[in-house]
Amino acid sequence: MPPSVTSFTALDALTHAIEAFVSTKANAMSDFYAKEAISCISKNIETVFEHPNNIEARQQLLIGSFYAGIAFSNSSTNLAHATGRALGVKFHMPHGQCVALMHPFVIQYSLESAYERYEEIAKIIGLNGTHFLSGYLDELNRKQHIWKSAQQMAPLLTDEVIEQLAEQALSGNGILTNRKVPSNEEIEVIFKQLRKRLQIEGGIVEWQQCQVEK
C-alpha cells in the first residue's frame, strides 16, 4: 500500500473517532466505540507510519478504523469533515488529506465548547491536557508530510476562494453537529489559519503563529 494511502486513511479514521465523540448527536453507543477507536488508533498510528510492514499494528489500526466507523455512523462527524469536503471538491484532493489538514484548526475553534470531551480524548491519547491536542495532530501531519504535500495550495487560497470554501462548507453536513456552530466569517478564519500554516516551512510550529486577525 502506498504510504500516502496509509497516512490519509489513518488520519481520517482518527478524525472520525474524535468527531463522533464531540458531536452534538453523541450517545452511549457512539461514545463507547469512539473511545475504543481513539485508543486503538493513537496507540498504533505512529508504529504503522514508521514500520509499514508491522502487520499487528496495521491490524489494530484497521480495528480502530472499524470502531470509528460504527461511532460516527451513530453520531455523525462535524466541522473538520464539512470544511475538508469543501477543500477536496475545490482542489480535487484525497478526502483523508483534506480532513487531516482541517482538523487541528477545527479543534482550536471548538475546544471551549466541548472542553470536557476533548479533555477525555487527550487523556486517552496520553497527552497532558487539551491544549496539546491540536499540536499532536499537527505533529502527525508533519511526520507524514501532510503539510508539505499541500504547500502548493497556499497561494491558491485567496480571500475570494476562501469565501467560496466557507459557503460550500456551510451548505453541507457537519455544521449543526459541531458543538460550536460556526458563522460564515468564522469558517473563513479557519481556512485562513490553514493558509498561514501551509506558508510555514518545517520545524515545530507554535500555534500562535497560525492565528489570523478575525
Residue ranges of predicted features:
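C-terminal charged capping/lid subdomain of soluble metabolic enzymes
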Residues: 126-214
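Amphipathic alpha-helical interaction segments
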Residues: 32-36, 60-63, 82-85, 101, ...
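Short acidic (Asp/Glu) and glycine-rich catalytic loops that position anionic groups and cofactors
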Residues: 42-43, 80-82, 114-118, 141-148, ...
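Glycine-rich phosphate/pyrophosphate-binding beta-alpha loops
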Residues: 68-99, 172-174
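Carboxylate- and glycine-rich phosphate/diphosphate-binding segment that chelates Mg2+/Mn2+
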Residues: 1-75, 185
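Catalytic phosphate/nucleotide-handling subdomain of diverse soluble enzymes
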Residues: 86-128
